[in-house]
């Protein structure tokens, strides 16, 4: 073929947003060039060099060559949002080319800031103290700063700010929430000091004031949450319950909660009112039972709330998420480590549940055919599988005395998940199976990446100082 200069194309990922990973990869494809002599370089928008590049060998296709280059950028830099693109430059004997490669866009959402104040009788101790609670919700990206002011001056002591957490949601961009509390003296509060929760996010400042002379802000507007039935509740109670939670009610006597089907038909709804909360509000829950088949069909159900404080009814609609792949869990039962048994104190049995989808799973322990009390074991929340996108794993840890284990008592881990043939499977372990792993026949090799790291960390977090060793029978 005749000599020709390359044509350039940007390569960008359509996967997760940069807030989910530590680095962001973008690439550049050079195509249809001859001869096979090409040099890639990368620059930021301001023309400074990017060093973290990776080239791939050129490929001959249809008489001409193609090659790619990749650059890895720290996601915290991309999150700054100062560069919309980076520049891919190519040198070739038949002409130099350059192409702008766009960087992923972060969903930038401001926080909603609310301050919850103590009720009049909420002060205790000597001197009498209580807490102000500040909550920032619905923001992205996760970098945020929360501080407290009293009469405009920063407060240094009595502040506790939790870690930023991702909010649970089915779809849409990942958003975050954070809670901060300030311990206050009753004398300062009744002396009408003005306290301020200040939230700094992406160069913007959000402030919410609180004082004993302020009337409750309209920010404590009534909120409605429609909660779908969990698989665990369906499995345990054999009923499919829709739950509608209403919060921040100033009075409870005029609230009504009703569930309706997609066709408008009412579903019998039972309502419960809470006791008064620390911020002097009430909450209410409206529950309705439906057929599991109706829920599984994808039918939409709507919760409608009326109250004298609302100018018009509030509505929330839910349905079972569509298109979620079903993957049955693999269940592995790991006996106590020998080092732990040698201490003659307790025995820890671990039930590892891996590779399942959707994330809803139920784990229960049994001894001699009887369910054990939930206080005896700890089950983790389902977490995404590191190596298998869209699948989850969880683990449950049962602690018994070393004497019980050594008597040869058998323990059974029961796992229920909607993808299992009969919705339930179980694994049993006792002293005679020590050194073995009770598991499905397939894929124990794939277990190590997940098991060794997470179980050890989980045990350490529960203050076990012994090393956990997992034995595999060849």
Swiss-Prot record:
GO BP annotations listed: adaptive immune response; antibacterial humoral response; B cell receptor signaling pathway; defense response to Gram-negative bacterium; innate immune response; pre-B cell allelic exclusion
Side Extracellular, residues: 1-450
Bridged cysteine pairs (disulfide): 28-88, 134-197, 244-303, 351-413
Membrane-spanning segments: 451-471
Reported effect, residue 410 to A: Has little effect on IgM BCR assembly
Cytoplasmic topological segments: 472-474
InterPro entries noted in UniProt: Ig-like_dom, Ig-like_dom_sf, Ig-like_fold, Ig/MHC_CS, Ig_C1-set, Immune_Resp_Modulators
Effect of residue 450 to A: Blocks IgM BCR assembly
SUPFAM superfamilies: Immunoglobulin
Record region (CH2): 106-217
GO cellular component, one term: hexameric IgM immunoglobulin complex
Record note on what altering residue 418 to D does: In IMGT allele IGHM*02
UniProt KW keywords: Adaptive immunity, Cell membrane, Disulfide bond, Glycoprotein, Immunity, Immunoglobulin, Immunoglobulin domain, Membrane, Secreted, Transmembrane, Transmembrane helix
Positions of the UniProt region annotated as CH4: 324-452
Residue runs in coiled coils: none
Pfam families documented for this protein: C1-set
Entry comment on modification after translation: N-glycosylated; important for IgM secretion and its localization at the plasma membrane. The interaction with FCMR is glycan-independent.
Signal sequence, start to end: none
Origin: domain of life: Eukaryota
Consequence the record notes for mutating residue 430 to A: Blocks IgM BCR assembly
PANTHER family: TAPASIN
Disease: Agammaglobulinemia 1, autosomal recessive: A primary immunodeficiency characterized by profoundly low or absent serum antibodies and low or absent circulating B cells due to an early block of B-cell development. Affected individuals develop severe infections in the first years of life.
Quaternary structure and partners: The basic structural unit of both sIgM and mIgM molecules consists of two identical heavy chains and two identical light chains; disulfide-linked. N-terminal variable regions of the heavy and light chains form the antigen binding sites, whereas the C-terminal constant regions of the heavy chains interact with immune receptors to mediate effector functions.
Protein name per UniProt: Immunoglobulin heavy constant mu
Protein source organism: Homo sapiens
The organism's taxonomic lineage, starting at the top: Eukaryota, Metazoa, Chordata, Craniata, Vertebrata
